[in-house]
Amino acid sequence: LADHRDEQQPNGVLPDIIPTGGWGYGTDNGLDWTSTIAIIPWNIYLFYGDSKLLVDCYDNIKRYVDYVDRIAPNGLTSWGRGDWVPVKSHSNKELTSSVYFYVDTKILANAAKLLGKTEDYKYYTALAEKIRNAVNDKFLNRETGIYGSGVQTEQSVPLQWDIVPKELKRKVARNLAKQV
């Protein structure tokens, strides 16, 4: 991830391709691709119990999350490519990008707690909850347990990343199972 850190712009933006010769900063290189700056160090820590990579990337993750927060002050963002591979279904890009904004913010809050950064922990925990609430308020039909239009990605991404309210997880999971 040293290349990630080297390629990050001062404002927090990462390019589409890492390493890059300068290309990929002005495209839709948003959260669904560049969340690697947070997800990889966190999962290395979870798997190995080694926090070195998390420590090394902490300021970069923070700069990245702060950038997204500046461009998405309401907690929702459509910055990114979205789920562009499926031929027949189209997922809402604002839904998937906002979930990854939540993921990165939650990882940052957890890393802050682990590293004893109490003020950061409080701030980013509150921000993560704001994002989670914004996603659920806009995209979750609480009666049906369906996110967005109900396609697989729109159901699976909130489940995978723990956006779904506890009392609705079964319902959302059943809806996903119907799509598979």
What are these regions (language model features)?
Residues L1-V180:
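Active-site core of glycosidic bond-cleaving carbohydrate-active enzymes
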